[in-house]
Amino acid sequence: MITLIIFSFLSFLLGIILSFTAYKFRSQEDPIVEIVNELLPQSQCAQCGYSGCYPYAKAIVENSEKINKCIPGGTDLISAISSVLSIEVPEKNLIITHKKQKNNTVLINESNCVGCSKCASFCPVDAIVGAPNFIHTVLQEFCTGCNICLLHCPTNCIEIKKETYEE
């Protein structure tokens, strides 16, 4: 019984020490970065030139990065970010940072698809549907053309047909 009391007291004491340490050494992030990050679509598609939505939000706030690089967010996102940051909406609606898809069609070759579901599990916007061990298909209206599914397909049955243009 005394062992239980000692361990309870030590656990309580360590909890207080950890709480104080976490409070004292917490990260001092800018709350505006969090607000901008919440506005972004969280598709982590990297079409803006950054590895994900949070690094792009941080660059917008801290480095004055252009706010019109998020392709999936579109013009509504540009308006929302400009109102949060109290800046003007840029004249050019969207900036395409790399060679990107204007009209893309993602096709899954059904004869090669083994139904492993890897493409669907890695799709950041859930544009690929299908059940394990069955053929999968792409919902074109949700697909952002990020090519992540292409990288994870073990049978190379995903094909992206696209028209491209440069900025």
Swiss-Prot record:
Part of a membrane-bound complex that couples electron transfer with translocation of ions across the membrane. Keywords: 4Fe-4S, Cell inner membrane, Cell membrane, Electron transport, Iron, Iron-sulfur, Membrane, Metal-binding, Repeat, Translocase, Transport. Binds 3 [4Fe-4S] clusters. GO terms for molecular function: 4 iron, 4 sulfur cluster binding; electron transfer activity; metal ion binding. It comes from the Bacteria. Belongs to the 4Fe4S bacterial-type ferredoxin family. RnfB subfamily. One of its GO terms (biological process) is electron transport chain. It comes from Buchnera aphidicola subsp. Acyrthosiphon pisum (strain Tuc7). One of its GO terms (cellular component) is plasma membrane. This is Ion-translocating oxidoreductase complex subunit B. The gene is rnfB. It is found in: Cell inner membrane. Gene3D superfamilies: 3.30.70.20, Electron transport complex subunit B, putative Fe-S cluster (1.10.15.40).
